[in-house]
A protein has these predicted regions:
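Hydrophobic alpha-helical core bundles mediating ligand binding, dimerization, or RNAP-core interactions
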Residues: 28-33, 53, 57-60
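A short helix-loop-beta-strand connector motif used in the catalytic cores of GNAT acetyltransferases and
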Residues: 58-73
Length: 174
């Protein structure tokens, strides 16, 4: 497992990854109930309360013990920006990234940091992302090197799966 707090510096921000259990649960409730965020989360719902946040956080954090990877809390310039990382989905390490709208412009830098860890220190052979069919603006994922890899249903919701291998990664990611 990676260290619990890692910092990545670039010209614009200080990016830190921490355990989800280090975040105030009210911040997670606020993020996961944000109407703009919910539009991007087909499995999300606006009734995500404090009790659900605590249970959800424990389940996400337990993936580190069970699979050797899991999602992190993401901080940008010492502010909670969201959560993301690799989470177990149907046998795959699936990349999830949920950011507060104030931080949506930071997604690519966070993605690069996660993918680099996945293929170096974590030794992943591939990672996936799942997108709902309603997400039609997806040219960017192909530029990053993702390839179509079938479809899956999770909790009754249909997703398209895309897979990234180290050898298909775009040079802009490495």
């Amino acid at each position: 497992m990676l260290s619990l707090v890692e910092a990545v510096f670039n010209l614009r921000m200080l990016l830190k990854f921490k355990r989800l259990t280090e975040v105030d649960p009210l911040d997670i409730v606020s993020l996961n109930n944000n109407p703009d965020v919910l539009l991007q989360m087909p499995l999300g719902s606006a009734n995500f309360d404090l009790a659900k946040a605590k249970e959800w956080t424990q389940q996400k954090d337990a993936q580190w013990q069970q699979y050797g990877y899991g999602p992190w809390a993401i901080f940008i310039d010492q502010q909670f920006a969201g959560w993301g990382g690799l989470q177990y989905e149907e046998g795959d390490a699936d990349l999830a990234l949920v950011l507060h709208p104030n931080f949506w412009g930071s997604g690519k830098a966070i993605f690069i940091a996660i993918v680099k860890r996945a293929f170096t220190s974590m030794g992943m052979e591939s990672i996936t992302i799942l997108l709902p069919p309603s997400r039609t603006r997806i040219k960017g994922i192909f530029r990053l090197g993702f390839q179509p890899d079938g479809e899956v249903d999770i909790e009754g919701t249909h997703f398209q799966r895309f897979r990234l291998y180290p050898h298909t990664m775009a040079r802009s990611v490495t």
